[in-house]
Amino acid sequence: MALPIIIDCDPGHDDAIALVLALASPELEVKAITSSAGNQTPDKTLRNVLRMLTLLKRPDIPVAGGAVKPLMRELIIADNVHGESGLDGPALPEPSFAPQSGTAVELMAKTLRESSQPVTIVSTGPQTNVALLLNSHPELHTKIARIVIMGGAMGLGNWTPAAEFNIYVDPEAAEIVFQSGIPVVMAGLDVTHKAQIHAADIERFRAIGNPISTIVAELLDFFMEYHKDEKWGFVGAPLHDPCTIAWLLKPEIFTTVERWVGVETQGKYTQGMTVVDYYFLTGNKPNATVMVDVDRQGFVDLLAERLKFYA
């Protein structure tokens, strides 16, 4: 039986590719997709979900827009990474269908309530929608199998010296998620910076030759430009968000550890930092499965294999 999932995302190039990977994988049943503000403004991220589902010919999947700002802060966006539309680069279709009239939290709650088995929530943007769901529907916690997030880092940040972007946008929401008691799987920068797509990989995807693999290659062409800056020291572009879906499909290509994670919400220099108790110094019981390494070639091969689904 396929694993039921809800995807909460803020497309974003890597979010879009995570959607492509999920919808090419029969092991997963995508029951709903919700959008969050983050990589771009909330109107643009919602539109990008609809554009991607139009491209992938999946108007059957319920879609709803989420919170327009973080729980306690003003919104920060990453237009310097993802461009004016949030998905700059390829020519994507205009949406062929409309989102549902309700909110992301309402759609998530309805999906959980109606599911015959616990649902995995995959969150590839700020955690605002997920935190609002957890706070407003404690009766549904048992219907959530786990929450798989792209966010955080044990080491260096990518938005501040200490913080990864998704967590930095809404650290209060992320703290709610980590301390919820629901199993959390964290794909942080420690692993996603190793999941780099090289120029040769982009050409491999392009050579698959179907319309979707071509779009993915064009998304990566644009995404690669930001990551060419020498300060990063990257060979390619780190494909953050698809690590969440790849872990669900092939956990064996990842190395993980069980650790306690908390989120700094007040530090002068460390707001948004995920504090990972790697050496068990706090006495707190582990609350997260933390990804620390990935077989990069296995990750690339999985993407290439699933892109052939769209032939």
From Swiss-Prot:
Broad class of enzyme this protein falls into: hydrolase
What is the E.C. number? 3.2.-.-
Pfam families named among the record's database cross-references: IU_nuc_hydro
Keywords associated with the record: Glycosidase, Hydrolase
Active site residues of this protein: 240
Keyword Hydrolase appears in the UniProt entry: yes
Q: Name one GO molecular function term.
A: purine nucleosidase activity
Give the GO terms filed under biological process for this record: nucleobase-containing small molecule interconversion; purine nucleoside catabolic process; pyrimidine nucleobase metabolic process
What do the Gene Ontology cellular component annotations say?
cytosol
Query: Which InterPro entries does this UniProt record tie to the protein?
Result: I/U_nuclsd_hydro_CS, Inosine/uridine_hydrolase_dom, IUNH, Pyrim_hydro_RihA, Ribo_hydro-like
- Free-text function comment from the UniProt entry: Hydrolyzes cytidine or uridine to ribose and cytosine or uracil, respectively.
Report the PANTHER family cross-referenced here. Answer: INOSINE-URIDINE PREFERRING NUCLEOSIDE HYDROLASE, URIDINE NUCLEOSIDASE
The record's family statement is: Belongs to the IUNH family. RihA subfamily.
What is this protein called in UniProt?
Pyrimidine-specific ribonucleoside hydrolase RihA
Q: What species is given as this protein's source? A: Salmonella schwarzengrund (strain CVM19633)
**Which lineage is the organism of this entry classified under, starting from the top rank?**
Bacteria, Pseudomonadati, Pseudomonadota, Gammaproteobacteria, Enterobacterales
Q: Tell me the name of the encoding gene.
A: rihA
